[in-house]
Amino acid sequence: RQMCIRDRALPLQETLHHILNACDHEGISVDCDAVIDCTVLADRELLQRVLNNLVDNSRKYGANALSFGSVCEEDTVTLWMEDNGPGVPEEQLPCLFEPFYRGDAARTKPGAGSGLGLAVVKKSMQQMGGNVRAENAPGGGLRIVMQLPMAKEG
């Protein structure tokens, strides 16, 4: 069944507020100090689902602290989320968003999931005209980098 995508102007900080509440409830500390409040063009429900999926994924693999940041450039908003989990071996990073792919940590951890969560994230980002990639964070952990169109003023 095809989902109806309703792209609209969404303030980034308002969108992250929902995630902050969910993380607080789960006992995950979140730092959003590096988030610049710009407005993305995205489907509210789909973007919330993407962010929830990413937070869930980090929590599953041992993260208990997240930080978000953003940069607004011309017509694109780049939002990233870093966790304090174990990170991912460099050679596995390109495969993380493939359906049913499960890295070393997922294969050895009971109840770690089916390998579909990040594939859904990638598809959802593409449906909203954006993209997503993973890299290891400089201080350890995983950094997920998302790009979405910036909403035009007026």
What does each model-identified segment do?
Residues 29-39:
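Conserved catalytic submotifs in the C-terminal HATPase_c
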Residues 64, 128-130:
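Conserved glycine-rich
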Residues 65-75:
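Short beta-strand/loop element within the Bergerat-fold HATPase_c
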Residues 83:
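Acidic ATP/Mg2+-coordinating residue in the GHKL
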Residues 88-101:
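Short conserved segment of the HATPase_c
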